[in-house]
Design a protein with these regions (language model features):
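Extracellular beta-strand elements of beta-rich domains used
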Residues: 301, 401, 571, 600, ...
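Short, aromatic/His-centered strand-loop micro-motif at the edge of beta-sheets
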Residues: 815-834
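Secretory/extracellular carbohydrate-interaction modules
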Residues: 741-812
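Extracellular polysaccharide-degrading/modifying enzymes targeting complex plant/algal/animal polysaccharides
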Residues: 38-345, 384-389, 624-634, 643-698
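Glycine- and acidic/polar-rich repeat regions and solenoidal domains
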Residues: 281, 308-331, 345, 349-359, ...
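Carbohydrate-binding surfaces in secreted/extracellular proteins
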Residues: 779, 827, 835-864
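Flexible glycan-contacting loops in extracellular carbohydrate-active proteins
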Residues: 860-890
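Extracellular glycan-recognition surfaces and repeat-rich motifs
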Residues: 710-749
Length: 901
């Protein structure tokens, strides 16, 4: 039974059919050199740790000088329960094996043979004290018992008392947990999805009658943060969920492993493998202290089976699974480290994780697959002071490698993640089958200074990304200033995100603050939501690309800026969906003046390009605004689109518009090794399939007055998301205070500060769901001098990532609504704010706003339309700090009611 679109895939046999991709033979070991040590299962030196200690002794004795100690690794499996740890004293070592399938560093252990029960469930004994959250059976990853077997359960209602870790479930969905004893209930894990990440929380308590479930682990955002549809979750790790082939359950009390076999498995030939070591190799360098691990290389070595423990409370969600600092191979402070013709497989968390102060690292001709999280994560500190300069990482090369099948445990893992690093190259790789992004660059939100420079992502095949599980992703995804960086000659296809809450998915995605990037000569095809997305940024260039077979829009620009955000030049946009558009995104058509578009060719193969294809405007209006003077609406004359033959026939109008043909088949692995190429071509993923449409979330009434929260706390009513994790030690925060509330005894204080990440924090959000009638929202607001609060009312239910109906701000001491000046904001005085928003009927869209300072006269304004005409429902209320200065303001007495005729 399948797992498509949820935490697991439906055909684990195909995903993990490693035998079909085995290299026929290892690469030659290169020019013969001196062998100083032989590591062999039956030799004098039998363990990797003993070999490393012997190498250290050889170097200390002076027997080896001026070159690395050569350690020949004989075929065999070398079992590690603890990682092989390199310090600076272990520099200049080379481990060389004949083949990564023959010489394997193994972090797991085999259990006793299975016995088959009459009910078809196999079992085997588990040694006392052995605890694990991953399992492999017959070399293939098995699935921890889970319900539902495919796709998701949906949370019914938010719990306002504990919005980040509690919710109300449908009673039938949690009924199987009702009879569990407390110790078994505490081991049940709740998998939670939130747009671009997911996490786990073990059950703290359950009220089966009401369906109220509380997790021990809080998620980083309120569970109903995205609220157009009900949030997703699944339940794992209890006996009643064991009901499908390939699933397993560890009965801790009975010390037994229970397993339902997959087709073709027999007890005589099938063994279970349990991971023991969390890492196989650790590089314990510290560049700031002058302790650098240098000149270490591995050739022809396999690294298999590592564990990731979800822990007694769970593990919080985080973009790119960046909160999980565990990898099969991991460390910091390395220099001249290389992996050639290696294999990293069957991991609990990331494959290779190298952090602060790692420089000149090469991964070549290496297979990285079957990953609990991401493939390769590389990056260090982003120093704002010179004292941290040693933490900067640089000069990573990932070349001619295959990185695939990630996110088995932590779906937000990325194929290759590069953050706070410069002069890196990811070239000629096959990167596929991840639930989140393929390659990521950056890791600074907004326009703050970064160390990211001259990074190159080129000639990669990146495909089958997203798989319908997460959102707000890209085949290539960037953040922050990346001056001098280039994304070129990549072939990207099938990037598809979750179709429910959260932002969509794109082929190329320049997210918050991206600047200085050039995207050229890329082929981006069949990315449902769109080919490219510019959130906000500065001077990014998309030039000479093929953007093909998208459904919603070729290009998106979300936030208007007062400078050039993006240049889109000499590209071909070609789509087949008659409802597809060339351009979409935030703001009005008039706001599109921050982009430069010219020389682009647009064509809808299903018929005429619709009149609203250019951000709601037609071609003539688009050109009248100054765009695409050299562009055209014309068939590019592809050779055979039905067969993905995107060559241009003679006379193509794309050529006269300035497009230069390029060979997208040059992307991917290279060389003469036929087996390596065949491995890259192997189809080991499932066909994409969307989850069923999630039920809508309807909440028409809300109350929040902060009275029940202790002074100094961050409230989780409505869902409060403060930048406490993202900005440790920074002054920006939320807190309940008892000084001068609008009513009662308490209010909520917002304190903004410069350089907070993300730049829209602190923030408080309220999930709701009003589609009809009149939504009546009221709250009290008090500002201090210089404060610039923003209140946004959003609709997440449409085709856009979201639309904004109302944006109320305080700027220069004045209340402004949707750009219209209203009245003065008196410092230190509470203002009662009331909005009435008709969402249906003859007055739909004609809304009103009243602001009344305490002790003063009211100011009232009527509006004929919402900020965005596509705003149709109120699903999200946000109180946001967009400011970049130190400022303070207060919120109290939030109320939402809905009137129906």
């Amino acid at each position: 039974m399948g797992r498509q679109g949820g935490l697991y895939k439906k055909d684990d046999m195909k995903r993990n059919a490693f035998g079909a991709c085995v290299l026929a033979a290892g690469l030659a070991m290169g020019a013969a050199g001196a062998v100083d040590l032989v590591l062999a299962p039956d030799g004098e030196v039998r363990t990797p740790a003993a070999a490393l200690a012997r190498a250290r002794a050889l170097r200390a004795s002076g027997a080896v000088a001026g070159r690395p100690v050569e350690i020949q690794v004989a075929p065999g499996r070398y079992h590690l329960s603890e990682p092989l740890t390199f310090t600076a004293a272990d520099s200049a070592v080379r481990f060389r094996g004949a083949s990564p399938r023959a010489a394997v560093f193994d972090g797991g252990r085999a259990l006793a043979p299975f016995t088959a029960g009459a009910d078809g469930v196999w079992e085997t004994a588990v040694p006392d004290g052995l605890v694990f959250d991953q399992l492999w059976v017959g070399g293939r990853r098995a699935v921890r018992a889970r319900t539902p077997n495919r796709f998701y359960h949906y949370m019914k209602e938010a719990d306002e008392t504990c919005a980040n870790r509690a919710f109300f479930a449908e009673a039938a969905d949690v009924a199987p947990l009702a009879q569990l004893p407390p110790d078994e209930l505490a081991r049940v894990a709740v998998a939670v999805w939130q747009s671009w990440d997911m996490g786990y929380g073990h059950v703290a308590s359950l009220d089966a009658a009401s369906g109220r479930l509380v997790m021990k682990q809080a998620m980083k955002r309120p569970l109903f943060f995205w609220c157009a549809t009900r949030p997703r979750y699944a339940l794992e790790n209890f006996r009643a969920a064991l009901d499908a082939p390939g699933e397993w359950f560890h009965d801790v009390k009975a010390r037994k492993l229970l397993y339902i076999p997959r087709e073709g498995e027999t007890v005589e030939r099938t063994r279970a493998h349990v991971p023991v070591a969390t890492s196989l190799v650790v590089f314990a360098g510290d560049r700031a202290r002058g302790e650098v691990v240098r000149d270490v290389s591995f050739e022809g070595i396999g690294f298999e089976y590592t564990a990731f423990r979800i822990g007694p409370t769970g593990v919080a969600n985080a973009q790119a699974a960046a909160n999980v600092q565990e990898g099969a191979l991991m460390g910091a402070g390395v220099e001249n480290l290389s992996f050639t013709n290696c294999r990293i497989a069957h991991t609990g968390a990331h494959g290779l994780l190298l952090r602060a102060g790692s420089r000149h690292v090469a991964v070549r001709h290496t297979l990285v697959e079957d990953l609990g999280a991401g493939g390769i994560a590389f990056g260090g500190d982003n120093p704002r002071d010179p004292a941290k300069a040693a933490g900067v990482s640089s000069h990573l090369v990932v070349e001619d490698s295959i990185i695939r099948h990630g996110g088995h445990t932590l779906q937000a893992g990325i194929g290759v993640w590069i953050g706070h690093a410069h002069d890196c190259a990811v070239v000629h790789n096959e990167i596929c089958d991840f639930f989140y992004t393929g390659v990521s660059l950056g890791w600074t939100w907004g326009y703050a200074p970064t160390v990211n420079r001259r990074n190159r992502i080129a000639f990669n095949r990146i495909h089958h990304i997203g798989q319908g599980a997460l959102s707000d992703m890209g085949g290539v995804y960037t953040l922050g200033d990346n001056a001098g960086s280039e994304v070129a000659n990549n072939w990207i296809w099938e990037v598809n995100g979750y179709a429910g809450n959260g932002a969509p998915a794109w082929g190329l995605y320049t997210d918050e603050g991206s600047q200085g990037l050039v995207f050229r000569d890329n082929l981006v095809a069949r990315c449902r939501d769109g080919a490219i997305h510019q959130h906000y940024g500065r001077e990014n260039v998309y030039s000479n690309n093929l953007f093909l077979a998208f459904s919603k829009a070729g290009a998106w620009r979300s936030r208007a800026e007062d400078h050039v955000t993006v240049r889109v030049l000499n590209n071909v946009f070609w789509w087949t969906d008659p409802d597809g558009a060339a351009w979409r995104g935030g703001g009005s058509f008039a706001s599109m003046r921050d982009i430069v578009a010219d020389g682009n060719l647009y064509w809808c193969a299903a018929g005429a390009v619709k009149e609203t294809a250019f951000k709601g405007a037609d071609w003539a209006q688009w050109r009248a605004q100054g765009h695409d003077a050299r562009g055209a609406l014309a068939d590019p004359l592809f050779a055979d689109p039905a067969k993905d033959d995107w060559r241009l026939r003679p006379g193509s109008p794309a050529l006269s518009a300035g497009f230069r043909p390029f060979d997208w088949h040059a992307a991917g692995v290279y060389g003469t090794d036929a087996a390596w190429r065949a491995c890259a071509e192997e189809r080991c993923w499932d066909a994409f399939e969307d989850a069923p449409k999630a039920p809508k979330y309807r909440r028409e009434r809300l109350r929040a007055d902060f009275e029940r929260f202790p002074v100094g706390n961050v409230p989780h009513t409505m869902g409060a998301f403060a930048p406490l994790d993202a900005n440790p030690g920074r002054p920006g925060r939320l807190a309940v205070v008892d000084a001068d509330p609008a009513q009662g005894r308490k209010a909520l204080r917002f304190a903004d500060a410069p350089d907070l990440k993300p730049d829209w924090t602190p923030i408080v959000t309220a999930a709701c769901g009003v589609e009809a009638g009149v939504a009546k929202l009221a709250f009290a607001l008090k500002v201090e001098d210089g404060a610039t609060p923003t209140v946004e009312l959003r609709d997440y239910s449409g085709d856009e990532p979201f639309t904004v109906g109302v944006r109320l701000t305080v700027q220069k001491g004045r209340f402004t609504a949707n750009g219209r000046d209203l009245c003065a904001a008196r410092p230190g005085v509470w203002h009662d704010v009331a909005l009435a928003l008709p969402l249906s009927g003859p007055r739909a869209g004609r809304w009103s706003l009243t602001v009344t300072p305490r002790g003063g006269a009211s100011a009232r304004a009527e509006f004929a339309s919402f900020l965005d005409a596509r705003f149709k429902a109120l699903t999200w209320i946000g109180f946001i700090c967009y400011g970049a200065t130190s400022s303070v303001w207060y919120l109290d007495d939030l109320r939402l009611d809905t009137e129906h005729d």
